Design a protein with these regions (language model features):
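Generic beta-strand hydrophobic packing signal
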Residues: 7, 23, 94-96
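Generic N-terminal initiation segments characterized by hydrophobic and/or small/turn-forming residues
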Residues: 10, 27, 31, 67, ...
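Phosphate/anion-contacting hairpin/loop surfaces
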Residues: 18-33
Length: 99
């Protein structure tokens, strides 16, 4: 299964005894993931809007073989309703593979 969200925690793991591989990817690779089938669990409304998704606060449970794409916000607290990132902030595209 493929998931797309803005955060990843160990609480998402169905089995805590797995290996995880993560790496920064390009926005082109992130955008390519948006073209296929995926489960949107984007919990932050403004980050979701910035990557072209709707907010969808759901619980997920990932297992071996699943892939999670993230738009990870890095910066000062994002003001509610933001449509652009504040100075010094970035969105980092990441790919997390549960092995």
């Amino acid at each position: 299964m493929i998931y797309i969200g803005n955060v990843f925690t160990f609480g998402f793991l169905a089995n805590k005894n797995v290996d995880i591989k993560s790496r920064e990817i390009t926005w082109a690779e992130f955008d390519q993931a948006l073209q296929g089938e995926f489960i949107n669990y984007m919990g932050h409304e403004d980050v979701a809007r910035m990557v072209g998704l709707e907010q969808n606060r759901i619980s997920i449970s990932v297992k071996s073989g699943d892939i999670v794409y993230l738009a990870q916000y890095d910066g000062p607290r994002l003001e509610e309703g933001a449509t652009v990132l504040p100075q010094g902030a970035t969105l980092v595209p990441l790919k997390v593979e549960v092995l």
